[in-house]
Structures are given as structure tokens and as C-alpha cells.
Amino acid sequence: MLDVNFFDELRIGLATADDIRNWSFGEVKKPETINYRTLKPEKDGLFCEKIFGPTRDWECYCGKYKRVRFKGIICERCGVEVTRAKVRRERMGHIELAAPVTHIWYFKGVPSRLGYLLDLAPKDLEKIIYFAAYVITAVDDEMRHNELSTLEAEMVVEKKAIEDQRDADLEARAQKLEADMKELEEEGAKSDVRRKVRDGGEREMRQLRDRAQRELDRLDEIWTTFTKLAPKQLIVDELLYRELQDRYGEYFEGAMGAESIKKLIETFDIDAEADSLRDTIKNGKGQKKLRALKRLKVVAAFQTNRNSPMGMVLDAVPVIPPELRPMVQLDGGRFATSDLNDLYRRVINRNNRLKRLIDLGAPEIIVNNEKRMLQESVDALFDNGRRGRPVTGPGNRPLKSLSDLLKGKQGRFRQNLLGKRVDYSGRSVIVVGPQLKLHQCGLPKLMALELFKPFVMKRLVDLNHAQNIKSAKRMVERQRPQVWDVLEEVISEHPVLLNRAPTLHRLGIQAFEPQLVEGKAIQLHPLVCEAFNADFDGDQMAVHLPLSAEAQAEARILMLSSNNILSPASGRPLAMPRLDMVTGLYFLTTEIEGDKGEFTPAAKDQPESGVYSSPAEAIMAMDRGALSVRAKIRVRLTQLRPPAEIEAERFPDGWNMGDAWTAETTLGRVLFNELLPRGYPFVNKQMHKKVQAAIINDLAERYPMIVVAQTVDKLKDAGFYWATRSGVTVSMADVLVPPEKQEILERYEAAADSIEKQYQRGKLDKGERNEALVKIWQDATEEVGQALRSHYPKDNPIITIVDSGATGNFTQTRTLAGMKGLVTNPKGEFIPRPIKSSFREGLTVLEYFINTHGARKGLADTALRTADSGYLTRRLVDVSQDVIVRETDCETERGITVTLAELQGDQLLRDQHIETSAYARTLATDAVDANGNVVVERGHDLGDPAIDALLAAGITEVKVRSVLTCATGTGVCAMCYGRSMATGKLVDIGEAVGIVAAQSIGEPGTQLTMRTFHQGGVTGGADIVGGLPRVQELFEARIPRNRAPIADVSGRIRLEESDKFYKITIVPDDGGEEVVYDKLSRRQRLKVFKHDDGSERLLTDGDHVEVGQQLLEGSADPHEVLRVQGPREVQIHLVKEVQEVYRAQGVSIHDKHIEVIVRQMLRRVTIIDSGATEFLPGSLTERGEFETENRRVVAEGGEPAAGRPVLMGITKASLATDSWLSAASFQETTRVLTDAAINCRSDKLQGLKENVIIGKLIPAGTGINRYRNIQVQPTEEARAAAYTIPSYEDQYYSPDFGQATGAAVPLDDYGYSDYR
């Protein structure tokens, strides 16, 4: 059987009138919808049952046939087929138009596809379609040519006749005038009377002459128009057209409206046109060539595919199924209807009126007006508001047309296809669940009962608590006691998914094993809050239930929170102790001098004290109150491994479990080390947050995930336990103001006064004064901070919280207790009056007021940032969604070089960015040390141990595989991508690395600052664009705001300065032509860089520059870098620049994520010369396609195409994707669909988005083909294990029960009759 959901590609094209009639189940003839009295659809109307199917299941309109047994019968009275009512969602109708109309998408879109095809300007096209001008559709050249002389002779005769008539009339008039004058003379009339008569006569003669001349001109115009008449010629003058029609009607044909367009398309020779355009492109130049290129794109589209251009002119309009444009009755007897019904009604009304007018034989002008109105109503139906004023409904609201139903966030694509609501889900407020294990969550009983309802009902029936499903449902709804036991059983081992919006990265949805809890709030494990970015101030989370066995397996294996400890962005653990836990562990591992029971060496009069033979003994002493947790003691340890240096010294053969050694430490640290996995070296340090992070990091590298999960859980429990016992609380009494604050401020006040005096005397200008004041008050704030620091005791709770790294920083403490210091105004400049009060003392009114500026700007910024960052993520996901790991190894030899360390003198300095560049990559070549020994071989994964080995061998840089050089056609290969950051192993085939990359870059986007910073100072430096705007600028490949020129060649520079500009000339090393950079603004300052001698200084006259080097401060234009240095360099440049922005904010993202996006930006090639290939010059194609086609042509002995790589911004790259579904659901929906339909585009369904839209499994992860034929089948053992009797062997009454076999209890075979 053919499965409707099983297809490999989806094609879109133009529908012809025949297609529309084939889809249709009948013609809609009347504009009526529903009879308001009977509420039944009108016959032949927009909701007609005969066309679209019955409104009730198995029931015809007149009620003759009811019930399912008449299935498929067509009622002879009302003509309705007896079938299911849901066919009203799929059956279409159509409207037969009395006159053809054009499709607005192809006429009005930019560029106008109809205009390009017919070579007509859009303005002219509009005149023709809307009946403002006639167009010539055909001319019989041969007949005209043959009979031209005859016609010319006729024309000459006609002209002669007019001239003769004119002469005769003039002659007669002249004679009459003469006679009149004679008569007047005889009568002796006055001279002015005579003059009047003469003037009148002459005027009349002039009029005669003019009239004749006009007629002659008219004839000339008609003749010249006729001799030059050509198809596609516009005639705006109606009278001229009428004359031509009357005189020479048999030599040409012309018309107006869509009919004429239809005729033009029918007679259009596509192949001939394509050939002539190709010819123009080969030999033409300038504008002509460009226009030919653009036209060829449209013409070639119709030439190569099965599309007929006739589809752009419609003879029939499809009517979509009525259930998709419903009409519902409101209370009060009124109806609410979809806008489409109104638009359809207008079309039907005008069409019917037009038919009637044509039948009546109405005058042409009236018919044309009606045709124009029909055209406009069809335009409004397809895309309301695209041309002219939109059609409005009640309350002047534009009606939503078919195009509007697809567009935008509320359109079909984004609202219903990409984001659906799902069943088996719920949401509630979250509270903390400190007693949970990392893989558990607390689910409220009532919510669990509702979610697991079907499972509970089935199990109730299985266990014979209920006879049938109906009674089971009643039991569940009444919450009978048995239900809760069954719920416990059903819920065990069935993971649920928790999600917190906004889901910025994949850790925003994780799986947990539910534990039933009282109350109505979901309990969340404290360690996963970081990943969800959740806190407990009223956040809500949604719960989803994976139903099928496969879904549960995926949830458990791939999504369980204990398997997602590492961040996919940086590969470092996210499930770290934070806040209270950090404070607790910090308190536990602190060492306090002179605390109770501390170690004292032996003296004359007393033996040594504070020495313990085992941790147990020390704990006993603590319980008795003889020893403090934080006192320094000596203790003999046998179960904990000594630190590396002690192990090397004491146990040369290596330490084994049980070997004793003595540690000088505190009891707290011993307790802490007992939480770590066995065999982990003893950590004898105070546990600052950074140290804790380093330990967990190390665990993640060395131990399996399960061990790490257990360890962080233990750390969490210990952290909370000791945080409670530490008694760290914050009260007003803990905020201490340093006593010397006043004295410090007075000193600086005096300095500020002296600056103010100098300013008033005119020694300083305003800028200098402000700068000096800012400097003074910054120093003052700094000094108050230092005084504060020295004044605070070590055990102050606020200091403990800050020093342990739990939360907050010293600046906040200074604001609370010292002074707030300088604040900024809305422009981002410092206000030179500081806020001298601390929050503890309280601010004055003025201070409060100037502080509000900065605070409000912060809030506004955050709101804007969130939206911007979300949009950036959306574009990134869209551009990279089809990057999936498709194979294990593409076997390329290429790679990129990364730096591991720098040689400074004789020692190696480890590169600080090694974590995000070399870490987790695969080596492309063997790493060889100075003696030629292979340290790490090719294809090896660079983890921390491998990197340490390379550094120990003195290797400074290595060549690694990268997605930038991957040779896989679609997607990337696992070796080039390297290790998956989230699992710490080589990435799996099917992993959607593109989306992971987009999320990793987008998720920290909110932390990036919005502001473009100003460099302080008099020099008036240009803005430094930083933060989110800079990241967008890079990914969109825009020309940067402060663009810096780069050296086109390597050579020496000559620098000339004028008062406003620099002029830089580069004299190339190879003796080529000099390159001149003129008019470089001096505001942009020269670049500081390392010169050949190793010094860092400004660029000066006579310096040597390398190709691609920046000459001024600012950012290089990536398009320039591509032009000068090629694709590889521009990729590295973009990665580096994006990383700079993120590193400035302290965000750690691995380079490989940025590389994935950059790879997508450089996927395409512009064809310069098509050679023997099918490509059109000037068009964009995928690099892979380009290379394949060239190989094929070369193999056949043809000329390959020439192309150059282009850098596209992410928005443009998303819209240029091969998949029209993905592009249409991204932006500019109508434009993308118009283009796809004309080109008859086919979507191969390779990305994720396309498959989500049509409801198939996505081709990533377990949805990839190689995993699709795996089925889950429960085995007998698994069934047995599911419901075993709990074993009682180790209890007191084991003999009575016998051995538990673990076999399933065959409950189905028991007879329960006697129990009832």
C-alpha cells in the first residue's frame, strides 16, 4: 500500500486551469453561504454539500439516506454523496471565470516575473491588465508587406481628397469674403465694421486650414503607427486604436486585460527567446547584459521544467475546502466567518455579473470595467493589499487573504507547522527539591494522574480492579485509593520531559524520572537550574510525556539529566554546585588557626594533640565537641589516595587501597574528599567555586558520566548540609561602613575643588575638566573599596559569600557598604559628580535621581537584547539546520593549524584559548616533536591528557581537522567535527551539529551588551562596535561601521598626512603596481601591530606590511578579506572576530560551533562563465554541485564553468537554501514561493525544518535512515522483570515464602471469582 506520508521529495509548480478543474468536485456558482433559517448550506454556494460533502457523517442533505450502510451512495434527490463529514476538509471546488485574470504574485512580485518573461515594463503591464491600454498581440507581417503599396496609394488618395476639399472650401470662403467686402464698400460702411468682417472671414479660413491639417496629421499618425505596428506594442489612445481597427483590422490583433496577456504567452516562443538572450549575454555589455541575465533566469525556468507559463493567467479559481474557512454561529444569531469567504463572495458576485453583461451584449466599456473589477477581486483573494488599497471588512480592517494565511509568525508555517501544541503535557510552578537525585524530579500527584491516565486505566483493568475501560476511567476521575498504588507502579521507570521557556539551547528540555509529591508544584533538582536558567521566584515549567517505547528509550538514554552534565557549547560541566552549595563546601574546607582541638606538636610538659588514627576517630571527637570541623589536625588515612607529589615520594610503585599515609589537613577536607570517587587524589585546599569547577571538570574527563552524576549529587547534599550549619546569613549588622571613609572623601573633595578652580580660571576646557574629575573620583572609589576590604573581618558572612564565589562580587559589596561611585548618563558618559553614599547609609535625592539614568537604561537594554538575541538565534538555526553528521570520515587531508603555545625566551607559554580552539578536535597529521618522534598520531582526539603530552614535548602548533575543510557533500563528517562537546566522545552519525552550533552561539547572546562603547578621551575616537550588534554584523557579512582598509599586497608603505586625511601607498615587494589608499580619515587612527623586529607600535612611514594586514583601527570588511586572501582566510577571520566579542564577555564557546555557521556562509559560488555546463552566468550554486558538474563536463571533454566563492550573510544564505519549504517558513514567504513555483523547485527533504513541516521524522539523531529499521520488542525476560514479586530473602520470614525466582506472576490466569 502507498503510504501518504512516505515520499522522498516535494515539488511545487504552477497549476493550470485543467489542474484546478481536476482537483475540483464541482463549480461554486452562487455567493450564498448558509441559509440563516435552516442553518443548512445553500446549494451551489460556498458551503454546498453537493460539492464539498455532507455536514454530518453518513447523512445526505435531504435526509433520504442516513447511517453508514449507505456508504458511497450519491443521493438522487439532492446529489450529496453519503460519506464522512471530514471530507469537507479536503474536497475543493472551483469558480469558472467569465474572463481570464492574471495571478498577482507573478505580475506584482519584485521582480515582475510576467514582465521579465514578456519583456514588458511593470508599468505597461499594469496598464494592460487593468484596462488602461491596448496591446498588440499579433501582426500579419507578410500580408501587410505585400499590400503596403496598395494601402499607401489608398492613403495618398484619401489625403488628396482631404486637401482638395480643403482647397475648395477655402476658395469658396475667399469668394464670399470678397463679395461681402464689395457690398460693404458700396454701402459706405465705417472702416472698423469692414475690418471686423475681414477678420471674421480670415479666422474662419484659418479654422478650415487647421481642421484639415489635424485630419492629415491624424492620417499620418495612423499610417506610421500601422507601418511600425509590432506585437507587444502598447496603444494608450483609444480613438487611435479604434481607427486602426476599422481601417486595418485584418492585419493585426490587439486586446486589453488578461486576455491579451494570455494571447501573448500562447504565441511566445520560449526556446527562441532563450537562445537570443544567451547570445546577448555572450556578446553584450553593461545594462543590456544584466537585463538579459535576469530575463534568462525566468525564461530558462520555463524552458527546462514541465511548467507552462500559461499557469500565470487563470481561467478558473480554486475554492479551498469549507472546513478550512469555517462559518460559526455566535450567540445572538449572528455569524462569524473567515475573511476568505468574503473575498470569495466578491469574486463570485463580480463573475456572475460579468457573465450576465456578456449575455446581454452590453457595451464594451461596461464589460471591460466589470472585467477589471473581477481582476481586482481575484488579486485581493490571492494577496490583499499587494496592489492599491486593501479590501477592508467591518471596522476598516484589511481582510486576510490566502497569502496572509501563510506569512509571518501567525501564519500557517510558523504557527501550525513548525510549532504545534501537544497532548500529554501540563505545566506548573517549580519549587526546589533538594532531596532528589540528579535524574529525578518531583511530579504533583494530581498532575501525574492526569498525564498517565490511559496507562493507569489499562493497568487497573489488567489487575481486575475494574471490569472495563469505562469503569476504570470513572475510578481515576473519582480518585479511588487503588488508583494511587497503580499510579506508583505505572510511573516507575517511565521518564518525563521537563521544559522551561525560553528554550535557548538543547538543555532547556531534559528527561527525569518522576517521583510523586504532594502539593501542586513540580520539584526540580537544584543542580539542573543552571542548564534551564531557572530560579524559584515563580518560574513555571512544562511537563511532556514520551509515549512509545522508542521515545522512552531516547528520553532515558539521550535526554536524562544525569547524561547531560556537560555544556554542548564548551564541553565543560554545567551541573555544578552553586550559591548555597558553594558556601557550604567553602565553609567545610576552610582552615581556621587556633580552632578547637587543633594539632599542637609535642612539648616538654605535654604530648602532641590533635592526631587521629582514622577519620572515624576524628568524627567521634567532633561529635563529642572536642574538635572543630575547621581545625588543622593530623590524621592517618588508608581509604583516600594521597596527592600526586606525596604518592611519588612515599609510594614509588604506586599507592594501593589500604596503604596508610598521614595527612596534615582539617576534618572538613577529609569529609569533602570522601565524597569524591574512590582513587581520586586527595585535594587539600579550600574549596572556592573555581576549585570545585576544576575538580568536576577533571572528573568529567576521567570518569564515566554516572560517577560524575553521583559525585555532584553527593557534593550537593554536603553543600546544603554544611551551608545550613555554617550559619551564613545576611543582616544589616553585617554591612559595615569603613570608619575612614569620610576622611578619604574629604581628601579627594579638595582635589576636585582645585580642578574646578582651574576650569573657572580658564586653564582647562570642559572635556579636560570632566576627564580629570572622573579620574579623581574613580581613584576615590577604589580607595574606599580598599579601606572597606581591610576593615571587614574574615568571617563576615557577606565576605564569605563573595570570596567563596557563591554569588556577587566585591563591587556590589562596595556599593552596599562603601560608596556607589560614578554613574553614567543615557549617552554612556560618566557624570562627573559621584554618588558618595552607600546603600547602607542611603542616597540623597540628587544621588538617587542621577542613579536612575543608568538603572533604567539597563532595564531597557535587557528587554531589547532579549528580542535581538532571540532573532539572531532564529537566523542561525535557519542557516545551519541541515548540517548533520552524515558519515564517519570524509578522508580529507586538509585541516587548519591551531596554536597550542607560544615560545617566550626558552619556555612555552600555554595559549589561553586552547580550551576553545584545539581541545576536542581530531589531529589531521601526526604531531611530531623536535627529534621526529610521533607524540600523538593522526586521527587521535585531543583531550586534556593529549594536549598536556603535546605541550610536554614542546610542540607549539598542530594541524587539526575542521568543518571548514570537510569534504562531505551535504552535512559534515564526524572526524572533521571532532568530539561532541556534550558527551566527550567522537560525535555520532546523525547528530544535528548545525542546530547545536546555532544554540551555543545564540544562547549566551542575551549576556552580550547592546551598547556600542565610546572610547573615553579627548581624541574623539570612533565608536567601537561591540556586543550583539558586532556579532550580527559579522554573521550578516555586512560592511562594518568603522571599516578599516587592508593591505592588498605585501610591501613597504609610504605614509602622507594632511590635516584631515592619511594617504597610504604600498610599494609591492614583487615590483608590481603601487596600491594607493586615499582619503583615510584621521579620526580612525593608525593600527598598532607587531613588527618584524617583535616590537609593538603604530604603523609608520617605511614599515613593511603583509598582505591582508589592517592599516587603520577598526574592523576589516570580510568581503575585502575574501577578495584579497581567499575563502580560508575569511573563515578564520570571521571565527576570530566573533570569538573576540564573546571572550570579552567571559563566555566560553568552542570555535567549531562558529565554524559550522561560517561554513554555511561560504557554501555558494557565483558562476562567472558557464562553460559547457547547465549553469546560468551570474547565478549562485552550491559548491558541491558546482564541483560535481565540472567533473562531469571535464570527463566528457567539455569546458568547465568558472566561479568565484561568495560570502553571504546568514539571512541571505537561509533564503538561498535548496529547500524551498525551509526558506518559505523563514522570511519573505510569498517571494520564495513565487520563485519556487516558477522554477518548479523540488525539495529533497534533507534538512530538519522541511521534515518537521510535513510531519516526518527529522533526519537527525535516531530519525536518520540507518536507525529507522530498528524495532523495539519486549523479550520474555524483560516482561518478567517488569512485574516481579519483591524478594524477601534477607527478611525474617524468608522460609515461608520460598525462593523468589524473579519470574512474572501470571495474573491473567488466576480466577478471581471466589474472592468476589
UniProtKB/Swiss-Prot annotation:
SMART domains according to UniProt: RPOLA_N
Reaction equations catalysed: RNA(n) + a ribonucleoside 5'-triphosphate = RNA(n+1) + diphosphate
UniProt xrefs under Gene3D superfamilies: 1.10.132.30, 1.10.150.390, 1.10.1790.20, 1.10.40.90, 2.40.40.20, 2.40.50.100, RNA polymerase II, clamp domain, RNA polymerase Rpb1, domain 3
SUPFAM superfamilies: beta and beta-prime subunits of DNA dependent RNA-polymerase (SSF64484)
Residue positions binding Zn(2+) 1: 60, 62, 75, 78
Region of interest (Disordered), residue spans: 183-209
Biological process according to GO: DNA-templated transcription
Residues the record lists as binding Zn(2+) 2: 890, 966, 973, 976
GO CC term, one of those recorded: DNA-directed RNA polymerase complex
Cofactor descriptive note: Binds 1 Mg(2+) ion per subunit.
Classification via InterPro entries: DNA-dir_RpoC_beta_prime (IPR045867), DNA-dir_RpoC_beta_prime_bact (IPR012754), RNA_pol_asu (IPR000722), RNA_pol_N (IPR006592), RNA_pol_Rpb1_1 (IPR007080), RNA_pol_Rpb1_3 (IPR007066), RNA_pol_Rpb1_3_sf (IPR042102), RNA_pol_Rpb1_4 (IPR007083)
EC number: 2.7.7.6
Key words, A-Z: DNA-directed RNA polymerase, Magnesium, Metal-binding, Nucleotidyltransferase, Transcription, Transferase, Zinc
Pfam family, one: RNA_pol_Rpb1_2
Domain of life where this protein originates: Bacteria
Alphabetized GO MF terms: DNA binding; DNA-directed RNA polymerase activity; magnesium ion binding; zinc ion binding
Cofactor(s) recorded in Swiss-Prot or TrEMBL: Mg(2+); Zn(2+)
Listed HAMAP family: RNApol_bact_RpoC
Oligomeric form and interacting partners: The RNAP catalytic core consists of 2 alpha, 1 beta, 1 beta' and 1 omega subunit. When a sigma factor is associated with the core the holoenzyme is formed, which can initiate transcription.
PANTHER family: DNA-DIRECTED RNA POLYMERASE, DNA-DIRECTED RNA POLYMERASE SUBUNIT BETA
Function: DNA-dependent RNA polymerase catalyzes the transcription of DNA into RNA using the four ribonucleoside triphosphates as substrates.
NCBIfam families: PRK14906.1, rpoC_TIGR
Family: Belongs to the RNA polymerase beta' chain family.
Name of protein: DNA-directed RNA polymerase subunit beta'
Organism, as annotated: Mycolicibacterium gilvum (strain PYR-GCK) (Mycobacterium gilvum (strain PYR-GCK))
Lineage: Bacteria, Bacillati, Actinomycetota, Actinomycetes, Mycobacteriales
Gene: rpoC
